[in-house]
Amino acid sequence: MTSYFSLTMLGLILPGTAVAYQVIPRRARWAVLLAASYVTFWAISGKLLAFLLASTVTIWLCGLALDREIKQRGEALRAPGANRKAVKQSYARRMRLIMAAGAVVNLGMLFAFKYVVFAHRLLAPLAAPLLTHLGIGWAAPAAIAAPIGISFYTLQAVSYLVDVYRQSVTADRNLCRLALFMAFFPQIMEGPICRYGQTAQALWAGHGITWENLVSGSQRILWGAAKKLIVADRVNLLVKTVFASYESYDGGIIALAAVLYTIQLYCDFSGTMDFVVGTGRIFGVRLPENFRQPFFSRTASEFWQRWHITLGTWFRDYVFYPVSLSKPVKRLTTSARHLLGNRMGPVAASGVALLAVWLGNGLWHGAGGQYVLFGLFWFTIIWLGGFAEPIAQSIYERLGIDRSALPYRAFQHARTLVVVFCGELIFRADGGWAALGMLRRLFGQFSLASFADGTMLKLGMDGADFACVGIAIAVLFVVGLLRERAQHDPAASATPAGHAGMPAAATANTAATRFALAWWQNFNVRWVLGCALILAIVVFGAYGAGYVPVDPMYASF
């Protein structure tokens, strides 16, 4: 079982867990969720469950050690005649060591599973001559299967340790509660990357399954299944064909593959997040959203505030801010202000933290040259965008261009989409050199001839497939537009989200927004839409004869 939309998950694990959860006493419901989580993990990764357990026990022990140091520091500071500065420095040093030890253990396991082979490939040309001269043998390490979700739960583990160190949360003395936070079965494969303060208490609370949560959660799961099975899995064969032999195609086909891969990745990943959030809703747990209409973005920075949101905020809070506030970068910022001024200086200095974020982001996804290029690509786009913004603003003001006008906003959307498609092409390529080769053909040999001669219909998708995907994308656009307008309504956006992440209709200011939200949230309409989704999945889903099941794409990261 490697898919959330498999019969094993939808027909056995999820309903079985829900029934067992509801019938036993509230105080023991956490045990049902934890058992389901470990059974799911075992079904996918078998004995590698031991590494998840090791990670959990490590942060539990380190958290308790940090908690002890925090309490002892408080007692030492309250002691008569205490040298407060010396006490703070002493305990801060010890607490940093404890936090670092826990982080190193967890990141070390991640490195061992994901990056040893890549590191060997990079270092071998440099180290091999020296080792040969010294008579030391160095065998190439073999690639090994990693525990499912290790990239996700490792970041959760590190965030817990840092938050305890910062005293944002109190160390949990209950190992089982911490284990459930680390392993909750809907999010174990693909996230979202949660903070302890967001979900731990809700998972432990054992809220009963209500009819409203069951219906809204199930409909969210259906919506995710439709995105994955109707769109993502349908375009998979064309994407695989073109990326595997890009030398055989002109720039037009490569552009088509890049666009379809971006759509595939979004529908697969956001569809999986719909399952995860919907399942959490059934059990009364509000998991953080990972997507917020990313293709409505007008800049590259905005795109990454809407795409894989929990990963972006993790790197912001645990990499960007610490690096930016470090003493060397502060000194660099001061020097940059003197050289470049108060506007450009901080932008230039922020490049250090931004580079750390984007190299980390790229390598978090995988060990390969394409992931390094992916990170460098987005670093360059966003960093240079920071330099260009004040210059562009000055030019537009002199030319009298209204940046809030529809034509300019449309230009921004189109420009951002082109950047996104290029970035995802790099991301999907089979290696760094392949990414560069595809970009070279995309821009150097662009042609629409393959669309006219029928080549595009011989790559795994026929006319009916393209029509099906086109209609599905149109539906996604309309739903996204509805959500976008709802979230930009000042009154509606100020209220808690209702069904499917939308605010209550009664809070909207405009008549159009009120009508759209009321229609969306009408009970009968939701049931009709739910039945329509089931019918659409049955009729148009890419499964059965002629289709190869596609594992969740982000599960491999």
Where are the language model's segments positioned?
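Membrane-embedded transmembrane alpha-helical bundles that form the catalytic cores
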Residues: 1-556
